[in-house]
Amino acid sequence: MKFSQVATTAAIFAGLTTAEIAYVTQTRGVTVGETATVATTVTVGATVTGGDQGQDQVQQSAAPEAGDIQQSAVPEADDIQQSAVPEAEPTADADGGNGIAITEVFTTTIMGQEIVYSGVYYSYGEEHTYGDVQVQTLTIGGGGFPSDDQYPTTEVSAEASPSAVTTSSAVATPDAKVPDSTKDASQPAATTASGSSSGSNDFSGVKDTQFAQQILDAHNKKRARHGVPDLTWDATVYEYAQKFADQYSCSGNLQHSGGKYGENLAVGYADGAAALQAWYEEAGKDGLSYSYGSSSVYNHFTQVVWKSTTKLGCAYKDCRAQNWGLYVVCSYDPAGNVMGTDPKTGKSYMAENVLRPQ
């Protein structure tokens, strides 16, 4: 099996079973407000469906100088996000042969940023040959809320291969002061948790009202399971999401807007409900695979069910011509994923707002 890495020396891994996967762990030296320098370690790790672990074949690139490094943990097998790929016709690979092109996606988190890796390999029965694996370079820090006519652009190191990927944002820092809009994070909104169709919402000015209704209903169905109030559709929040979606390049790479709202992103999905389901399933299909009350993991799931968030606006850009499906942006007001402790209760905002399924 051959594996190559953008901006990294190509590594040859021989004799691996079809059950093994190559893990990529990114190491970065960070300067706030600037793009981080990147070094990448490629290893062969745990199996996915059985077989022996490949422990001998390792290729490592030069790492940043000590003191400037934030090292992410190599993902466990359960942390691999693998895109569902339909049956494919034989495709000519880089060597001129015919194989079934299969795309894999997995992620890791560095400095609170979710880094997405995707790669294509060609299946010839027992043999799997890896093609290019693309890596994002994200910008850490810097930037405030963009004005109406100036929205940030996506900055990445390379184009990725078509797959379904997602990313989410968090706000504040540990023990940070919470903005006024979220200072009463533990207080329920005036609405009740019904999970029913949100037919009373005003979708005036929305490009695709069917998409808006579908993704709002999908959110509220999940929130009802956790006993938290329904979200309502908000025109201002929607306009923000739509403007940010409109500037997307359909590259397959994801970067957050850096604005004042909570934000979940996804690309490669057929519709909004599918993207929402992927976000929610970070806690398992039933929402039970999460350490409620003790976890410090902020992700798409926690923003979806965040109790004190009351308003939603979601939009998309059609990237099907680039084989990327829909690029989905959901903005949340007030923002969820607030880090720190509520001074009134002494509890973490996470514990107050991410509740167990009922």
UniProtKB/Swiss-Prot annotation:
Residue ranges, compositional bias (Low complexity): 48-63, 153-174, 189-200
Residue ranges annotated for the SCP domain, each copy included: 216-332
SMART domains: SCP
Annotated segments matching region Disordered: 48-98, 144-203
One of the record's GO molecular function terms: cholesterol binding
Induction data: Induced during the switch from the yeast form to filamentous growth and by fluconazole. Expression is negatively regulated by CPH2, EFG1, RFG1, and TUP1.
PROSITE patterns in the cross-refs: CRISP_2
Pfam families: CAP
Keywords: Secreted, Signal, Virulence
GO CC annotation, single: extracellular space
Main location: secreted
GO biological process: sexual reproduction
Signal peptide range in chain numbering: 1-19
Localization in the cell: Secreted
PANTHER family membership: CYSTEINE-RICH SECRETORY PROTEIN-RELATED (PTHR10334)
Function: Secreted protein that acts as a virulence factor during infections such as in posttraumatic corneal infections. Acts as an important antigen in patients with systemic candidiasis and plays a role in the protection against phagocyte attack.
Family classification: Belongs to the CRISP family.
Protein's UniProt name: Secreted protein RBT4
Organism: Candida albicans (strain SC5314 / ATCC MYA-2876)
